[in-house]
Amino acid sequence: MTDSFNAKQFLSTVTSQPGVYSMYDLSGTVIYVGKAKDLKKRLASYFRAQVASRKTEALVKSIHHIDVTITHTETEALLLEHNYIKLYQPRYNVLLRDDKSYPFIFLSGDAHPRITSHRGAKHAKGDYFGPFPNGYAVKETLALLQKLFPIRQCEDSVYRNRSRPCLQYQIGRCLGPCVAGLVSDEEYQQQVEYVRLFLSGKDQQVLNQLVERMELASRALNFEDAAHARDQIQAVRRVTEKQFVSGDREDLDVIGVSFDAGMACVHVLFIRQGKVLGSRSYFPKVPVGTELAEVVQTFVGQFYLQGSQMRSLPGEILLDFTLPEKTLLAASLSEQAGRKIQIQTQPRGDRARYLKLARTNAATALVTKLSQQSTVHQRLAALAELLGIQAINRMECFDISHTMGEHTIASCVIFDGNGSVRAEYRRYNIEGITPGDDYAAMDQVLRRRYGKALEEKKIPDVVIIDGGKGQLGMAKAVFEQLEVPWDKSRVVLLGVAKGVDRKAGLETLFLQPHGEGMALPPDSPALHVIQHIRDDSHNHAITGHRNKRAKVKNTSALELIEGVGPRRRQSLLKYMGGLQPLRNASVEEIAQVPGISGALAEKIFNALKH
């Protein structure tokens, strides 16, 4: 506790109702968030003579003040606790560092439905299948579905503006509903129904319908249709035979845990309709001294209660660990889902098999992660020794990308002691400079990045500039001119110049904007980490530049038309499927775009034609 915090006086004011408490340090930063059925009893436990762990002891020493929020029920307190943890990211809480929404497969409710991937809120009319563990799993499934059931995957704007079928129709991957006469509505809807059944896990029902269709076509001597049905039957059977399917065909999430060397891995298997859709490993941030029970309890709560509108809750969650607050957590999840959610810790049969698989995956992923982390630590230690500093806790790298001076983008990527910190990668639009002036672009991004107050943990030990002596000299001049409250003198500036052939391993490093610089051997661990962060920075800049260039290309022609603002530009491009289809459209077709009058459509038509 800090000298200004009087625990005895504070506890005398605390209620015994359920609620959430937030602990702050001297700087006003939230360092821990917790919840309690009885706030007074729970908070008093922190200030006993014998505390539970080293982590609690360190936490209590840092407390400057505590805020309390009273709730009606313990369930409400649990939900609020996880919202606060997500908001404040306290350093003494176990933190789930990956809170992205999961992708689903979406089958639209259009007259000719489209199948595609979807993330985020489910506002559009149609059917959602999932969740899938990552975008790659969705992409693979969509590619498979396209081979089995040829329904469209194109954007609505493209579908509405086609006058002839695309390549997907030519190679048999789409029935071509965009062009009248290629496929009947009944035939298309039949294929859509097959997709719906297949994604719902009703493979046998799909096969039964296809067999019936093949037999009917054969009896009617329609051998071409019979052959198509036969080919679909064979394709579906090949796919379904490859996957283990649970007999109960329920929706499950299976969670396995592994813990070693202060690091935890939580592996989640996603099972829908008895099929394993995929899996994903998580490595929550675990404060020193945290018990494994708290890690698992907190992970499960954060995983399902934070941003749960983006997540599809299964009917049952399997764990290989006994949760202290299992009943409370199940009640909270059931309340969120509007139906009963079970948490099972002693499964049998197929469920036990799934749990063993999750445990094995967690252990394997943890071994791999620890090995990778060890390699990163070794490389950073080698670089720190090379630069003559004690350690590298944070490193940032900058790169510039443009095409002939146009659409300039600067990137900043960050590494910490464990490697890349992708959540903190940033891009900067560079404006107001002479086109192609990389020095001015670097000057601008460095001033924007560092010309402000920085938290202690955000101050880099090393800043890498992707460029030679000239860029490094400019960067040093910028840092000399900075007037900031943090210690800028601790930052080591390092210039990295590519060799004449621009090949990896031939880089020259500069610590000063003069002299010969130094070259490291190709097998140098220090060089490897420099190449890693430099390549990440380059790729991040290139991607941002390409996105900006594409956006400008699509909108520049419309920006000159009076009466067409950002919203109308977006609406026109989305409805028409891009600038080229818009250029080819008639006045009447343009007038069909929502928000575009006949007069404005004529103005747009004339402007794009001339």
From Swiss-Prot:
Annotated localization: Cytoplasm
Domain UVR: 204-239
Main subcellular location of this protein, as a coarse class: cytoplasm
Membrane-spanning residues: none
GO cellular component entries: cytoplasm; excinuclease repair complex
A Pfam family assignment: GIY-YIG
InterPro entries membership: GIY-YIG_endonuc, GIY-YIG_endonuc_sf, GIY-YIG_UvrC_Cho, Hlx-hairpin-Hlx_DNA-bd_motif, RuvA_2-like, UVR_dom, UVR_dom_sf, UvrABC_protein_C
GO molecular function: DNA binding; excinuclease ABC activity
Cysteine disulfide partners in this protein: none
Keywords: Cytoplasm, DNA damage, DNA excision, DNA repair, Excision nuclease, SOS response
Domain of life assignment: Bacteria
Domain GIY-YIG positions: 16-94
GO biological process, alphabetically ordered: nucleotide-excision repair; SOS response
Annotated SUPFAM superfamilies: C-terminal UvrC-binding domain of UvrB (SSF46600), GIY-YIG endonuclease (SSF82771), RuvA domain 2-like (SSF47781)
Protein family according to the UniProt entry: Belongs to the UvrC family.
Subunit structure: Interacts with UvrB in an incision complex.
Task performed by this protein: The UvrABC repair system catalyzes the recognition and processing of DNA lesions. UvrC both incises the 5' and 3' sides of the lesion. The N-terminal half is responsible for the 3' incision and the C-terminal half is responsible for the 5' incision.
Name recorded for this polypeptide: UvrABC system protein C
The gene coding this protein: uvrC
